[in-house]
């Protein structure tokens, strides 16, 4: 499933410059106008990355944040990992990394098997917590 971006060339140039979005074909955007959420039946996960850029090495989700930081927040890395998982499943495509943009700085986050596993464990823990009415289980 491919969701075509409906942006004219001049707007794409401005967006790329403003957010430091890498070269490639923007195949999805949610920042300029609301886009249809991506849904993975396999992982029962839904989300809307700000951009997806198709490059030679694969599909790259891009998440734009309004804050400025020295290092990315762990929660933002997990959010980006969820977008990588969605793109991998929905587009049936390789996702080598994602990008988080903060102000004038961006971070390229490798989408590794370790990050994917941490994400799936975190999602499972969150679902378990919801099933137990929000109570965390005591660890021995």
Where is each model-derived feature located?
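Conserved catalytic cores of phosphodiester-cleaving nucleases, focusing on short active-site segments
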Residues: 45-70, 79-85
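N-terminal signal-anchor transmembrane alpha helix of single-pass membrane proteins
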Residues: 1-18
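Metal-dependent nuclease catalytic cores in nucleic-acid-processing enzymes
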Residues: 75-97
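A generic structural signal for short coil/turn motifs at secondary-structure boundaries
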Residues: 69-73, 108-110
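A short, polar/proline- and glycine-enriched secondary-structure boundary/capping micro-motif
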Residues: 71-75, 119-120
